[in-house]
Amino acid sequence: MRLFNERVAANLIQSRTGLRHHMNAITGNNLFSKPRCESDIIFTASNGDLECLKEKLLSHDLYGAVVNVRALQVFMEAHVFAVWDFMSLAKSLQIALTCTQLPWFPPEDASSARFVNEIILNEESDLSQEGQAQSHLEMYLDAMKEVGASTAVFDNFLFLLKNGKEVEEALNLANVPEHIARFVTETLNISMGGSIVEVASYFLYGREDPIPDMFNALINRWDVSDLSVNKLRWYLDRHIELDGDEHGPAAQKLLQQVTRGEPDKIRLANCAAQNAIQARINLWSGILQDIAALESTSAQ
């Protein structure tokens, strides 16, 4: 069992490293360079630095800018990329914490494996409003169509990926805005090149922990009829329910398990947490600028 797990871990590291080196060769080591931690922060819920970053994210001006359907369309046309790349983080955890190769062997930590598999189950094949199995990405795309948001750029990006283009090239050819491209590439860099500690921390602090508060902030401040955004409202409420009640606490426990109280791993988790939150702030700021530019053009 130990030999098998070590072999699987080695293959995963080799695969991730190879992908990262290949991406760096394509990009000139710019977009796909590993995020640098500007300062170490203490990995505790009460830490001032981490709480300050989280507060900056949750008080972002973007939530107050999504006040009409056109602004919501701009938001969704960017946010769909975050909905998509979420699965790369989740799949990275699944590869590391469960057995995804043949022959199958039991995972070392069944509780962690169960948590990750539940995430995958919900994200890849949750039940829609109509009771049909559907991925959360598909639900989000349906919600975009309901509010009149364009899926053209995202659809083209996925088409290019499916037809063999590398991520960097697909982002460029699909004309994905830079702030979105940087968010996606940082997520994929962590997913494919990060350690299990980095991925688990990025997953918790960049996704599971802030999502309920972010989505609540959006819902509480928008000025659009719920009837016109029925599918989006259902999607947001579903994530608030799952991430707030189940996935968030489980992701916190998972991170504690993989760090094991070891100082080096805690520092690694700290750095990943900081980078994850800052990446989201940068994405929000880019979307806010797009909305402001739209309003400026409309006023002329």
Report the location of each language-model feature.
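N-terminal amphipathic/basic-hydrophobic helices that include classical n-h-c signal peptides
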Residues: 1-27
